[in-house]
Amino acid sequence: MDAKLIIDNKLLDADNNATKDVFSPWEGQYLGTIPMASSQQAKAAISAADKAWQDWKLTTINTRINLLYKAADIIKSKREDLALSLCLEIGKNISEARSEIDRAREYIMMTADSAKSLRGSLYYGDVFDKYQKHQKTGLYSRYPLGVILAISPFNYPINLSITKIAPALVMGNTVVLKSATIGSLSSFQFYTCFIEAGFPLGVINFICGNASEVGDIMLTDKRVQLIAFTGSTEVGNHIREVSLGVPLLLELGGKDAALVLKDADLDYTAAQIVSGAFSYSGQRCTAQKIVFVESSIKGELIQKLVDSAANYSLSPLINAAAADYIEILKEDALTHGAKLVLASSRSGNKLSPAILAEVTEEMRLYHEEQFGPILPVVTINSISEGVNKIKDRKSTRLNSSHVSES
């Protein structure tokens, strides 16, 4: 299936018919093409959203809620087709793909349900110590911002776009979605459900294309009132620099740590860490990316990690370059003295899990977000040392966990 741009509810090819072929990370099979939008088309999408906002912001909230419900119903009817597209395009197994579609639909429903109770607020003077009720009255109303620019990543093109878009729509904002190039086929199919549901012209627009062509054009457009982005820290910092003070919602990369203490249940710990590190080949911003373990239990935990990881086989990374990066990090760590306790195998862009012990701060793997199936283990001598190492790392911290029975 070929994707199209969605601008003012029209399904369009890119200017000059510029396209990019899409191949599955599973076996390299051809899936279709995506249009590579021009800068003029990116601006046209924002223009459509800006024009549509003038009427959409005046639409009753019940109308918006009902349109979201209708979109959710259409998504439910197309669940298998949407899940299969996601599976083939970004390399998730079919169970993970179905889960993403289901979660997205449930999020739409939850957003619509929650919006029913979102109204203005009335406060009287007696909420403050110095005033009586009749002396002051405060009326607070909710007002939509305008055009929202949503930018989604390849690994959760549906979940991590709908969490930006559904709340924006129900509160009377209009949206331009810039999807990652990988994931655009699935995103296009998903968001045509909103057009089918009857969302008015220009309320939701879909753009895909090279960031060099359309990225800064959209980021610096003064009609954009908020930018919501999920992706790498590098790109997030660029957005912060060029966005001219526009409100930002940024979810960036993370080197997510687990701190394992000597009284932890190691069977439970190993199972949780391995699942967190290697599901979807570690291609998640919240994947477990480094383990700090007290020295007295290091050997036992590592063996349990190795045993648990043996249940994972070759799985695709999004492309060969991603697999190359994992191999580079592994070789750098081994060169600097790390010990390979679980060796990975590779076939093209597919990798099986690798676990490295004796990882230290001199190694790139200690600092860099690997976004793949390789897990570094660092030895510590106390909880305070572990906490300080987690806090002091140069890399970003999106989340952390600790395991202890005390």
Label each PLM-derived region with a short phrase.
Residues 226, 234-361, 379-392:
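ALDH superfamily catalytic-core signature
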Residues 347-351, 368-374, 393-397:
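Conserved glycine-rich beta-strand-loop-beta hairpin in the small C-terminal domain of fold type I
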Residues 28, 64, 86, 108, ...:
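Residue-level signal for inorganic ion chemistry
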Residues 120-268, 380:
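Rossmann-like NAD(P) dinucleotide-binding subdomain of oxidoreductase/dehydrogenase enzymes
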Residues 1-33, 66, 70, 102, ...:
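Terminal low-complexity tails and localization/encapsulation signals of metabolic enzymes
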Residues 57, 68-161, 199, 204:
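N-terminal Rossmann NAD(P)-binding subdomain characteristic of aldehyde/semialdehyde dehydrogenases
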Residues 25-94, 296, 306-312:
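N-terminal alpha-helical segment of soluble enzymes
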Residues 398-406:
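Single conserved hydrophobic/aromatic residue that forms the stacking wall/gate
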